[in-house]
Amino acid sequence: MDKTYQPHAIETSWYQTWESENYFAPQGVGDSYTIMIPPPNVTGSLHMGHGFNNAIMDALIRFRRMQGRNTLWQPGTDHAGIATQMLVERRLEAQGVSRHELGREKFLDKIWEWKAESGGNISRQIRRLGSSVDWSRERFTMDDGLSEAVKEAFVRLHEDGLIYRGKRLVNWDTKLHTAISDLEVENHDEKGHLWNLRYPLADGAKTAEGLDYLIVATTRPETMLGDAAVAVNPEDERYKALIGKFVELPLVGRRIPIIADDYCDPEFGTGCVKITPAHDFNDYEVGKRHNLPLLNIFDKNANVLPAAQVFNLDGTLNESVDGSLPAAYAGLDRFEARKQIVAAFDAAGLLVSVDDHALKVPKGDRSGTIIEPWLTDQWYVSTKPLAEPAIAAVEDGRIAFVPKQYENMYFSWMRDIQDWCISRQLWWGHRIPAWYDESGKVYVGRDEAEVRAKNNLGPEVALQQDNDVLDTWFSSGLWTFSTLGWPEKTKALKTFHSTDVLVTGFDIIFFWVARMIMLTMHLVKNEDGTPQVPFKTVYVHGLVRDGQGQKMSKSKGNVLDPLDIVDGIDLETLVEKRTSGLMQPQLAKKIEKQTRQEFADGIASYGTDALRFTFCSLASTGRDIKFDMGRVEGYRNFCNKIWNAARYVLDKGEDCGQNGEAVELSLADRWIISQLQRTEAEVTRQLDQFRFDLAAQALYEFIWNQYCDWYLELSKPVLWDETAPVERQRGTRRTLVRVLEVALRLAHPFMPFITEEIWQRLAPLAGAQGKTIMLQPWPVANEARIDQAAEDDIEWLKGLMLAVRNIRGEMNIGPGKPLQLFLKNVSAEDQRRLSENDYLLKKLAKLESMTVLTEGAEAPLSATALVGDMEVLVPMAGLIDKGAELARLDKEIQRLQGEVQRVGGKLSNAAFVDKAPPEVIAKERAKLTEAEQALGKLAEQHARIASL
């Protein structure tokens, strides 16, 4: 084996071997265990969230595969409608071409070209992370089989009365010219205004105060062109007498009614609210309650129309309401119209005041443009009938959320679910399987031929397919079963569905998880007709944030690419990567400065195993995952530790009883075997409960602290002792080999590469059969091998050795200097342990002699420590220069006193505490505590040496 562990050298070659040997495919025996990869965007690249997700899924799949389950981890990518279309449009714009100039077919060809060019990027990255997915089953949400499944799902839902077309208010993205869902809208806190406008009362009506007008407050004066009413609270005494009367709409001249509705807050503004049902979601609900007309005043760009389109609530045209609008505003953009309308109100003496007002401004998460509530024809899924069984499946335990608290988030959304708008005005995606004849009548079918046959339409009837495509989340919602061949009753569908676990971030519980449950339960049935669930467990993890707890985003400049941690990246390339392609180029300088400070030497190459182990160790039940590069470095050291231990074991491991020769187990052998049983049980228990952090912790503790730090040291005196029986030496060699081999199997789901590399060399010595560690059996604890007596004895031994080690450290005595040891207050049990382990203790603690003091006997002046009730004494004569040691301690104490004074002064300075960021203050406080503790220890040491 190489002297040092070089991850690069082994990772790519092992992955190729595993893939070419087909180890990732289901083995065809045992109960099935299935995970579907949440499909990343085909044209994107993996971020830290994906890296985390993959580490967790692969740990589960490798664990279950070793347990003998018939595992399928199926990969695939998502066509990601809006994101991909925007990306390709931007590329074309850079060449001076728009999609409209190209036309639909040619534009789609361009997207497929781009997919072919960049689609392999994701697959390459997934491979680099060591993910053991079955590549032979890779799927894409727009491939032929999935397109058929999407059409089938749409048609069946339509036939069941669960998909309908209707004119409703939607979130309209005026830049992308498509409807988007509530979940794709981000609300931004901004400072805005509240305009107070006068609306004259009609027919000579007066308020209780004798005024002939009402004052309405609005944050969107431009929408007054589409007002259908003014609402007041039914209990508001000021306006009770006016309910049912009319106002004259300024600038337009339309008479609109005064209505009573609980939506109005009498305390807000004047208590009068303008109601624009076609341009505000709350007003739309008021309009439904009062059967108000819907006046749409904007086109798809949110420019004012020459005349309002007036509709009834059922989407039919309303011809009884006059939709005339002032010609002056026709064609104006909504914000320009706002300026001119406010100016017109002011000129007419109808602008009362303009107040500052905090707003929540809705913006599209992709385009960043302000969303316009807009009346348009769209396709909808009726979700309430689908939500009921989906809620029941979680309530009765057919689906479990881990951690359980996420069930509440799921329930609260599902119980208040709105119908789902599934049509998008895009070109890239699954085109809606609906056709229109010339009169506008709509027909739904799997293809045009089926539509014609089903509805007896001859060739003389011209049909035009709907131009819209389906929301990406519709096809993603079918992911667990469409990828297994549904609607055909395939063997794969029967074997691997329902799947076992979905691993996902909490941010897409609504987007994806809920919709998968609803669609799967409606469309996929068991043989007895009962609904299948898509998965039995939803493991929900938090968002991966940076070390300061900030969300990782391009604009913050704190994004890390998991492969840069695996392979390393130099500083200049990292700066270039973080500052190019910014939406806000003005941030580049700040991001560059921050990157140069944080990664002055770039990022070292840590290898996949260290990164994966970091992800697993961070997978707690919390909402957020704070990613810390220090942890990756720590786990890279852990890899080195395992590598060095393996080199020692391979060097010492020959003649370890491979052929059944007699062995004798030492106390240390029995102890480490006992500890191994406990670790096997603990790692298995924690993986069963999805506590990857606790499983990783148990493994780390066993390998680093017990096996490497203690057992390897305890093995040396046995192997060095020329007088030791050959059976005992063979027993220790066998234990070294076999315990490491089992530990490698336990670590394999977390660290696949290093464990495979070492296992290949160790397997012959351990008597292990098979070509790969991947398909070795998962270790199962044997309670009969738990040896409490050996554990107690070794704990005592460790206590004594640590006591001697601490005295050396405190008194500044070199580790190689032989010591005399006196022991006082020694019990019979202590005496037994001393005599049985005399050779071991003298060798490892570097002791010249050990003397048990009889009662009343005194040791020379000594440094002391306690092991239980037993006193450990090391005489100091000739070991230290008392004067020099006190002078050294005085100097160190003086330095620390200065540090305490400096940091304490800083923290008691109000100006510093008020202005410094919380993380800086926390750092300073930690510094102060550390210095104070060190000072206390040095003072004790000083007193002890002074008393010698």
From Swiss-Prot:
ATP binds at K554. The keyword Transferase does not apply. A motif ('KMSKS' region) lies at residues 551-555. GO terms for cellular component: cytosol. Pfam families: Anticodon_1 (PF08264), tRNA-synt_1 (PF00133), Val_tRNA-synt_C (PF10458). It is an enzyme of class 6 (ligase). It comes from the Bacteria. Its main location: cytoplasm. GO terms for biological process: valyl-tRNA aminoacylation. The keyword Transmembrane does not apply. Keywords: Aminoacyl-tRNA synthetase, ATP-binding, Coiled coil, Cytoplasm, Ligase, Nucleotide-binding, Protein biosynthesis. It is found in: Cytoplasm. It catalyses: tRNA(Val) + L-valine + ATP = L-valyl-tRNA(Val) + AMP + diphosphate. Its EC number is 6.1.1.9. Residues 879-945 form a coiled coil. A motif ('HIGH' region) lies at residues 40-50. One of its GO terms (molecular function) is aminoacyl-tRNA deacylase activity. Belongs to the class-I aminoacyl-tRNA synthetase family. ValS type 1 subfamily. Catalyzes the attachment of valine to tRNA(Val). As ValRS can inadvertently accommodate and process structurally similar amino acids such as threonine, to avoid such errors, it has a 'posttransfer' editing activity that hydrolyzes mischarged Thr-tRNA(Val) in a tRNA-dependent manner. ValRS has two distinct active sites: one for aminoacylation and one for editing. The misactivated threonine is translocated from the active site to the editing site. The C-terminal coiled-coil domain is crucial for aminoacylation activity. This is Valine--tRNA ligase.
